[in-house]
């Protein structure tokens, strides 16, 4: 009798378990079908473009993710949990510095995809105006590289196999600009705009992906991407650099919109508690996407990957935010003003800040107030992707930052192993990670 009772209780328990399982499966199916139907409806009415999840229950990661600032509500936001920010000492203070520079250069080796020995149109002793052609690519004669300043050609530096490294210009005290006919953006065709921008040298500010080369003027890019912030160590604040340039930036965006068959994408900084500059947020004619995360989230290539990856047959163009302003000024004024606001950074410097100068400024002129010893390294760009230059060199064509760091001449026994000081650590094996990213003074040692 006891055995029969046990069998009956076991059967009842099994039936109850099967009932519970069936109920859970049924509930899961209902939730899944409802989620799918809500997602389809959200896509139909366009409500999914802000990147929100639509469903009966929140996803697991939504229960624990950081709450977004209020300005990001109803915006398309892409968040990345990967990456690493390297906090360094020597950030540029929000102050405009006055620097008097006389020597500038344009360097053909800064451009990928062109002949190492382009066709040079000037000689030592020639006078040029800002915007005059200096050289062009032999394979693509329509791709012209123009002078950033007016002045005298004082030197043409060559490297191995007579490859041209730098064409140096001694700038006039009063700048003279080559005059161009202003295209009418409302009536000009795409071909007219490309011809006008190419003749002025402004097409060289675009980079073509994949491979990050000088643009092919015979193709129409699928899309054009612009990152309005940089997440690299000690990177410049582009919102500060472009403060007050709303009109020129909008004119540049309008021009870019006619150069592509697709869209102009604007990558905005969504990492802060307050919105970025109105120079960027007030733009029309571009699709805005906010990005949150750690470096390299500000890299335009990372943004392309998240927004609309490049297919094998695709070609897209990218351009720096400051260069959009150059194009805008050209459309508004009919002259080429190749100037850029540089961030002067690095812990060894006595004074950091921002300076607005023509492209390709001499490093010795730029750092004339600093005592840069042999124990310091000068980098055109940031510490991760920049190029080492000497005081006799020039800032790179696409760079908007100069960084000075100590050479790693002090060697430590097992320096890569012993957690002796505060230093960044991806693996979180050093004590600096416990203090939430305390800035450290960088040097060139890899420490393993």
Language-model regions: role of each:
Residues 116, 147, 163:
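Exposed loop/turn and edge beta-strand positions of beta-sandwich/beta-sheet ligand-binding modules
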Residues 116-122, 139-142, 351:
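Short, solvent-exposed loop/turn positions at domain surfaces
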């Amino acid at each position: 009798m006891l055995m029969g009772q046990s069998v009956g209780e076991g059967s009842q328990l099994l039936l109850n378990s099967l009932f519970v399982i069936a109920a859970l499966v049924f509930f899961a199916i209902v939730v899944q079908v409802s989620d799918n139907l809500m997602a389809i409806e959200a896509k139909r009415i366009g409500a999914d473009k802000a990147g929100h999840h639509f469903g009966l229950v929140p996803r697991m990661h939504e229960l624990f993710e950081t709450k977004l600032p209020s300005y990001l509500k109803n915006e398309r936001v892409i968040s990345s949990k990967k990456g690493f920010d390297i906090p360094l000492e020597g950030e540029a203070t929000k102050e405009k510095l006055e620097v008097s520079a006389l020597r500038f250069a344009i360097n053909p080796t800064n451009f990928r995809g062109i002949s190492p020995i382009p066709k040079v149109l000037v000689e030592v002793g020639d006078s040029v105006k800002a915007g005059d052609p200096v050289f062009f690519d032999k394979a693509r004669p329509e791709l012209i590289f123009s002078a950033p300043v007016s002045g005298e050609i004082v030197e043409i530096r060559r490297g191995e196999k007579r490859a041209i490294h730098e064409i140096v210009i001694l700038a006039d005290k009063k700048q003279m600009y080559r005059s161009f006919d202003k295209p009418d953006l409302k009536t000009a065709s795409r071909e007219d705009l490309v011809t006008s921008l190419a003749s002025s040298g402004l097409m060289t500010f675009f980079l073509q992906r994949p491979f990050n080369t000088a643009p092919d003027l015979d193709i129409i890019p699928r899309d054009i991407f612009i990152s309005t912030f940089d997440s690299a160590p000690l990177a410049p604040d582009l919102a500060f650099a472009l403060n007050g340039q709303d009109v020129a930036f909008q004119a540049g965006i309008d021009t870019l919109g006619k150069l592509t068959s697709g869209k102009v994408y604007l990558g905005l900084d969504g990492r802060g508690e307050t919105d970025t500059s109105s120079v960027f947020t007030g733009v029309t004619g571009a699709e805005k996407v906010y990005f949150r995360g750690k470096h390299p989230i500000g890299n335009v290539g990372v943004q392309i990957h998240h927004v609309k990856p490049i297919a094998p047959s695709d070609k897209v163009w990218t351009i720096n935010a400051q260069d959009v302003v150059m194009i805008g000024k050209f459309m508004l004024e009919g002259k080429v003003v190749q100037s850029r606001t540089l961030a002067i950074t690095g812990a060894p410097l006595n004074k950091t800040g921002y300076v607005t100068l023509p492209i390709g400024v001499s490093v010795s002129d730029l750092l004339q107030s600093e005592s840069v010893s042999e124990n310091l390294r000068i980098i055109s760009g940031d510490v991760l992707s920049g190029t080492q230059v000497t005081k006799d060199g020039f800032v790179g064509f696409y760079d908007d930052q100069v960084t000075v760091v100590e050479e790693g001449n002090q060697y430590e026994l097992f320096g890569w192993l012993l957690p002796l000081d505060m230093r960044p650590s991806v693996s979180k094996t050093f004590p600096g990670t416990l203090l939430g990213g305390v800035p450290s003074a960088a040097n060139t040692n890899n420490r393993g």
